[in-house]
């Protein structure tokens, strides 16, 4: 088996995790108590969904996941919620005091006390796997726990499970909406770790997803539940090929191989189509070409950044539902002819496609309509550098005055770490710039190694 372990860190990670496991259970027909009435093979470990669930002798399915937070309130909602019987109590790990939006607390003082316990639980899950293929790590970089403990855990996972791939689903601060004043600090410090210790990081931001909910689903005031259910659809589409059998299956390591041209250039944009409410879906049937086009629309991107301002290096299209390869090829051919969608000239093909015959499932009573087919796109575009330059700018404004820095230093962090992390991000922005332009100069020689410092 090729198992995947999900790690949900901090409030954002845990709440996105809730939405994801709710959806996985619906997709596989697993009840909130972990039983699966439709399962013919009780206790047999080779069903496709066993990549995400382990099965006990009694036929109960337990998610291969851990939920971590430095304070109990958010995880308590899992402990008392609908799916409380699904998880083993040991999988829900909480501390007593929170990171207070402070990276240093999550990474040094408070995170340090809990991290060994977390790794211990993750080790138990890993020992339960026959062929662990990697980790999915869910967190945000704006708060303290997701950024600090998230970074610490990734560093430790790199040591303990060196070669296993780590995919991060990371909520980045939005341009306009902020939940904390010190977000830029936490983000820069945490991205420094994400650069080193994740293989692929998919960037999400709340503002972009708010806008999608408002525009496409007519939700006037979207809640976090609305946002998380949309994110869950994306993550479900990416992992569908691990959990179901399909025509063109995509492995976790395949994402890496196809999307990451240079080790540092691994921050992805994602989009999902069709995002459509039940009233509208009643009147329209969306073709493969239409959903593919809409996945490339700037408005569909789940992070606030305009792909028209950059070039694509690679792009992964994961279709699910009633889709045949012929339609996909036609849709991709059309995309390639569009002038607005530019690829760097050293990446001539640039597309990886996956098809899964399981149609998308929706949460009953949720916002999304049940559709026949859907597509999720993950793309590596130089435009993502916009996200970093925005955060860097805010970081610089605050750091020039050393505002709020004492909170970090007081928790045992050195001031040099700020400048080190900031320089690393400056180098990253430069890397993106070079990757987009390096192919025009010279005779293509430095194109081979120019962007990989």
From Swiss-Prot:
Q: Where is the composition biased (Acidic residues)?
A: 431-453
Keywords assigned by UniProt, alphabetized: Acetylation, Cytoplasm, Cytoskeleton, GTP-binding, Hydrolase, Magnesium, Metal-binding, Microtubule, Nucleotide-binding
Using the UniProt annotation, give all residue ranges assigned to the region (Disordered).
429-453
**GO biological processes:** microtubule-based process
Which InterPro entries does UniProt cross-reference here?
A: Alpha_tubulin, Tub_FtsZ_C, Tubulin, Tubulin/FtsZ-like_C, Tubulin/FtsZ_2-layer-sand-dom, Tubulin/FtsZ_GTPase_sf, Tubulin_C, Tubulin_CS
Compartments (UniProt record):
Cytoplasm, Cytoskeleton
Q: Which reaction is this enzyme known to catalyze?
A: GTP + H2O = GDP + phosphate + H(+)
**Kind of enzyme, top EC level?**
hydrolase
Catalytic-site annotation from UniProt:
254
What's a Pfam family in this record? Answer: Tubulin_C
Q: Which cofactor does it need?
A: Mg(2+)
Q: Which Gene3D superfamilies match?
A: Helix hairpin bin, Tubulin/FtsZ, C-terminal domain, Tubulin/FtsZ, GTPase domain
Documented EC number(s): 3.6.5.-
Q: Name one GO molecular function term.
A: structural constituent of cytoskeleton
Which SUPFAM superfamilies would you find in this protein's record? Tubulin C-terminal domain-like, Tubulin nucleotide-binding domain-like
Residues where N6-acetyllysine is found:
40
One GO cellular component from the entry? microtubule
| Sites where the protein binds GTP | 11, 71, 140, 144-145, 179, 206, 228
Q: Which PANTHER family match?
A: TUBULIN
Similarity remark = Belongs to the tubulin family.
Summarize the protein's role.
Tubulin is the major constituent of microtubules, a cylinder consisting of laterally associated linear protofilaments composed of alpha- and beta-tubulin heterodimers. Microtubules grow by the addition of GTP-tubulin dimers to the microtubule end, where a stabilizing cap forms. Below the cap, tubulin dimers are in GDP-bound state, owing to GTPase activity of alpha-tubulin.
- Subunit composition and interactions: Dimer of alpha and beta chains. A typical microtubule is a hollow water-filled tube with an outer diameter of 25 nm and an inner diameter of 15 nM. Alpha-beta heterodimers associate head-to-tail to form protofilaments running lengthwise along the microtubule wall with the beta-tubulin subunit facing the microtubule plus end conferring a structural polarity. Microtubules usually have 13 protofilaments but different protofilament numbers can be found in some organisms and specialized cells.
Q: What is this protein called?
A: Tubulin alpha-13 chain
The organism that produces this protein has a lineage beginning with:
Eukaryota, Discoba, Heterolobosea, Tetramitia, Eutetramitia
This chain is encoded by the gene named TUBA13
């Amino acid at each position: 088996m090729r198992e995947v372990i999900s790690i949900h860190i901090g409030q954002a990670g845990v709440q996105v995790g809730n939405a994801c496991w709710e959806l996985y259970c619906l997709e596989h027909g697993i009840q909130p108590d972990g039983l699966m009435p439709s399962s013919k093979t009780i206790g047999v470990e080779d069903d496709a969904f066993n990549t995400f669930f382990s099965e006990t002798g009694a036929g109960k399915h337990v998610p291969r996941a851990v939920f971590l937070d430095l304070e109990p309130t958010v995880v308590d909602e899992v402990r008392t919620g609908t799916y409380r019987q699904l998880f083993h109590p040991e999988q829900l790990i909480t501390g007593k005091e929170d990171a207070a939006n402070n990276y240093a607390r999550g990474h040094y003082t408070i995170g340090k006390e809990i991290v060994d316990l977390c790794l211990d639980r993750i080790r138990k899950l890993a020992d339960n796997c026959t062929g662990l293929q990697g980790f999915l790590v869910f967190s945000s970089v704006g708060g303290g726990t997701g950024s600090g403990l998230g970074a610490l855990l990734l560093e430790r996972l790199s040591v303990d499970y060196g070669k296993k791939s780590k995919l991060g689903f990371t909520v980045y601060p939005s341009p306009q909406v902020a939940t904390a004043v010190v977000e830029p600090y936490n983000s820069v410090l945490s991205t420094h770790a994400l650069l080193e210790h994740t293989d692929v990081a998919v960037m999400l931001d709340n503002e972009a997803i708010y806008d999608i909910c408002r525009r496409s689903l007519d939700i006037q005031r979207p809640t976090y539940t609305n946002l998380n259910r949309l994110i869950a659809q994306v993550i479900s589409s990416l992992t569908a090929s691990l959990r179901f059998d399909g025509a063109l299956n995509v492995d976790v390591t395949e994402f890496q191989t196809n999307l990451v041209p240079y080790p540092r250039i691994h921050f992805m944009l994602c989009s999902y189509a069709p995002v459509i409410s039940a009233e509208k879906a009643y009147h329209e049937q969306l073709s493969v070409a239409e959903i593919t086009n809409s996945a490339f629309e700037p408005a569909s991107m789940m992070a606030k950044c305009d792909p028209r301002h950059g070039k694509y290096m690679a792009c992964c299209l994961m279709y699910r539902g009633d889709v045949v390869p012929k339609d996909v090829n036609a849709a991709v051919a059309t995309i390639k002819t569009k002038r607005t969608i530019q690829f760097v000239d050293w990446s001539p093909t640039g597309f990886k496609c996956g098809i899964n015959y399981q149609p998308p499932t929706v949460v009953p009573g949720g916002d999304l309509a049940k559709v026949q087919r859907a597509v999720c796109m993950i793309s590596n575009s130089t435009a993502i550098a916009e996200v970093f330059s925005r955060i860097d700018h805010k970081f610089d404004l605050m750091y020039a005055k050393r505002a709020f820095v004492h909170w970090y230093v007081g928790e045992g962090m050195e001031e040099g770490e700020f400048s080190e992390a900031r320089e690393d991000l400056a180098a990253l922005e430069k890397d993106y710039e070079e990757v987009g332009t390096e192919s025009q100069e010279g005779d293509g020689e430095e194109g081979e190694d120019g962007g990989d410092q």
